[in-house]
């Protein structure tokens, strides 16, 4: 992924340090801000992002858009509140809460509570969806 975004291949071996305000900005979902926190580490088994979900009043009473991608995902809430949908299940998460799930199934989220939600999202590749 980093090769496509920057033209530079991951080149760090063993470990990577990325400071609090640093990382590679990635466009994934409209309105959400994704900051890749280990873009240049070679041979990593997961992709860590700090994600900011904006609070949008117009989303609050609508069904949450569900997406799918291969593997698993772990979302750790840092600040704010998140309404998390996994297929037909809906949960509300706050600071310190964690969701770990099979991301090949429908999942989505929106910020709630009148403010953005910041969370650590770690995607872990898995088998391709057939």
Predicted regions: what they are:
Residues 23-65, 72, 122:
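A short glycine-rich, His/Asp/Glu-containing loop-to-beta-strand
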Residues 62-63, 101-103, 130:
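Hydrophobic protein-protein interaction segments
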């Amino acid at each position: 992924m980093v090769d496509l975004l920057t033209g530079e291949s991951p080149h760090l071996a063993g470990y990577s340090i990325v400071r609090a305000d640093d990382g590679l900005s990635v466009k994934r979902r409209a309105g959400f801000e994704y900051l890749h926190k280990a873009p240049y580490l070679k041979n990593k088994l997961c992709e860590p992002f700090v994600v900011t979900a904006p609070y949008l009043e117009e989303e609050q009473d609508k069904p949450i858009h569900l997406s799918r991608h291969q593997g698993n995902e772990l979302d750790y809430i840092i600040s704010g509140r998140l309404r998390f949908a996994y297929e037909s299940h809906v949960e509300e998460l706050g600071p310190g809460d964690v969701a770990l799930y099979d991301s090949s199934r429908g999942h989505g989220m929106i910020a709630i509570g009148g403010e953005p939600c910041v969370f650590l999202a770690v995607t872990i590749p898995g088998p391709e969806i057939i």
